[in-house]
Amino acid sequence: MLTSGTLMNPKHPVYIISKGRWDSRHTSKALEKMDMPYSIVVEDYEYEQYARFIDKDKILILPKKYIEEYDSCTTDQGTGSGPARNFCWEHALENGATSHWLLDDNIKAFGRINRNLYIHVTSGTIFKAAEDFIERYENV
């Protein structure tokens, strides 16, 4: 495991969309181990459960209007993660971000593969490297 070098975090905000997983919190635990900033988006009725485990400053409550105004283009009852995704996008724009990271709540660890070798990632540097790569191009 490499432990030397400059550690960096992403420039763009990182959001985790979560529902009903306050007990497992895989992605937030992984990001905490990496000392990476993030916000987790939850519905209001689950706020207290998440707040027992996650710093309240990191928790964003999904405004009801995003659920009520969401058109899932289907006859199914649920909206899925669409409302939360739209909220994250608008939240990022309102806070001056030109891009943002949107993560599911079931990621146990982050890593990269080089020459057929899996390397466990221990900082946000990998996100920053991806941003640097993407920002070289105008159509990404």
Report each predicted region and the residues it spans.
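Short internal beta-strands
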Residues: 39-43
